[in-house]
């Protein structure tokens, strides 16, 4: 596929780690720096009328730079695709962390909530409203710090932040009353309500307003009455009351939230919402490395970087900066490499870009070790990258003054967003304090990635020449990433979901349709490619036994010691729950459908051997669909198994 040619010059694609209505997210490795990234891939034709929202998200992320907001690195647009290269957050969703704990303690909630406040206050200070705040849109990085994602529904009102918005959007369970009534509203006030729902979920483990019936849920939200669990402290109850006010004019403001007594408890200062990482000053080490690599002067390189075009040069600079911040040398790779353990396979020419279109998961290459990209190199040297230097020399005479951001050409904005010049934001005086750490295990965890048991070369025609004489190295199946130590999910209360997308023109009932195995054509296409590439036994297949993993917050422990028995138990219960599935070794790729045949949920269940004797577990990962429906469904499946 020609749409992928340019992308594959700079990145090696691996497995799909998330899907949505019109997009999928793949794990990838940036070739020059060896850093892991997440690439959001969107089809323009499928987006249709939602294309302006993608432009809005890109514009927002280009102008937002904050320690608790997922960083945009690179935007690539072709005739049919839009690629957004984003910061990879291996820690997983806040939602998964909450349900693994049942609920968080008030102290831990405060640490998490202050980070959410910091991100949202900064977003508001830049004139934006997020409008889709929920646990699924908050990810943990490798340091267990939160990052806000998904700005597809954000709005930058015409005029100023006091301009009233009209669009009803977001998720019903988190939406403010004035928004679902169809009234005009202030984005900042609606976000405060959503943060109130978030705060409740953090401390309680379930939604304050929840019902299977949409109209019943609507009435509950409008009444503003919710259960107050006995374990909530008086100060937390008061804060929830102030945030979950049905009348937005009586709702607490963001300014007062930042120094609220509950938020300030155990802290000596209000929440520090200003950006700690502004792009007003370029890092000398990173600029020098890029200058040497592209054989250009420092001044030329500084001018090119400072134009912030969010092309490959911007991505390389920001990834070098991230690498340096993690204590790694700000150096670019000079050798041909692939991110993973060594594996000799047939030449990569056997896998063409045309093969890429046969499956969503055709780039699956196994469980990724976050550090392997920069450590595992092959001997043969690759030709120097000269294309960008040529472009840079041509652009040097035209490049804007340092610090000026280029506006996106042909912007498509909705009625609530306006094209405004972007400028660097000066930091105000920052509060200095040391945040207490969230109680996690000694080893920081990394996000579990759905893995394919077969390793195969990356389908990159653009890089075929420099890899022609070298064996291809792709990610192998690791034993799993360092993880949090938590137990079995046993929620205080079973949560139903009414996390309804308010942008949908129709509502659907709970999935009831029974079907046969799905993903057939996709899987068959992928299997043909894999069979052509390797004749040996697939590692990770049923004959090899389950993969070994460390205990993670999305792994449920069992009392069974026989993995085959557990796998049989799960496969027997899935049809009873109206779940279609495809088996690949000890991994079950599952999905549910509506009565109209629409896929409503996709997730994986993998039987794994935990890294201690005679203990078998189940790894769970949601790929698509409502988080609370997923939670309830997986609980029903696991409770039906004899574990």
Swiss-Prot record:
Documented EC number(s): 2.7.11.1, 2.7.10.2
Catalytic activity reported: L-tyrosyl-[protein] + ATP = O-phospho-L-tyrosyl-[protein] + ADP + H(+); L-seryl-[protein] + ATP = O-phospho-L-seryl-[protein] + ADP + H(+); L-threonyl-[protein] + ATP = O-phospho-L-threonyl-[protein] + ADP + H(+)
PTM comment text: Autophosphorylated: autophosphorylation of the T-loop at Thr-167 and Ser-171 is required for activation.
Residue ranges occupied by any KA1 domain in the UniProt entry: 594-643
Regulation: Activated by autophosphorylation of the T-loop at Thr-167 and Ser-171: in contrast to other members of the SNF1 subfamily, phosphorylation at Thr-167 is not mediated by STK11/LKB1 but via autophosphorylation instead. Inhibited by calcium-binding. Kinase activity is also regulated by reducing agents: dithiothreitol (DTT) or reduced glutathione are required for kinase activity in vitro; such dependence is however not due to the presence of disulfide bonds.
GO terms for MF: ATP binding; calcium ion binding; lipid binding; non-membrane spanning protein tyrosine kinase activity; protein kinase activity; protein serine kinase activity; protein serine/threonine kinase activity
Resulting phenotype, residue 40 to R: Loss of kinase activity
A GO CC annotation given for this chain: cell cortex
Subcellular location, principal: membrane
List of catalytic residues: 132 (proton acceptor)
InterPro entries noted in UniProt: KA1/Ssp2_C, KA1_dom, Kinase-like_dom_sf, MELK, MELK_UBA, Prot_kinase_dom, Protein_kinase_ATP_BS, Ser/Thr_kinase_AS
Modified residues annotated as Phosphotyrosine in this record: 163
PROSITE patterns: KA1, PROTEIN_KINASE_ATP, PROTEIN_KINASE_DOM, PROTEIN_KINASE_ST
Domain Protein kinase: 11-263
Region span, UBA-like: 282-321
Tissue distribution of the protein: Expressed in testis, ovary, thymus, spleen and T-cell. Expressed by neural progenitors: highly enriched in cultures containing multipotent progenitors.
Pfam family, one: KA1
Subcellular location: Cell membrane
Residue numbers carrying Phosphothreonine: 56, 167, 486, 510, 531
Statement: the UniProt record of this protein carries the keyword Nucleotide-binding: yes
Note on domains (UniProt): The KA1 domain mediates binding to phospholipids and targeting to membranes.
Complex formation: Monomer. Interacts with ZNF622 and PPP1R8.
Similarity comment text for this entry: Belongs to the protein kinase superfamily. CAMK Ser/Thr protein kinase family. SNF1 subfamily.
Function text: Serine/threonine-protein kinase involved in various processes such as cell cycle regulation, self-renewal of stem cells, apoptosis and splicing regulation. Has a broad substrate specificity; phosphorylates BCL2L14, CDC25B, MAP3K5/ASK1 and ZNF622. Acts as an activator of apoptosis by phosphorylating and activating MAP3K5/ASK1. Acts as a regulator of cell cycle, notably by mediating phosphorylation of CDC25B, promoting localization of CDC25B to the centrosome and the spindle poles during mitosis. Plays a key role in cell proliferation.
The protein, known as: Maternal embryonic leucine zipper kinase
Organism: Mus musculus
Chain's gene name: Melk
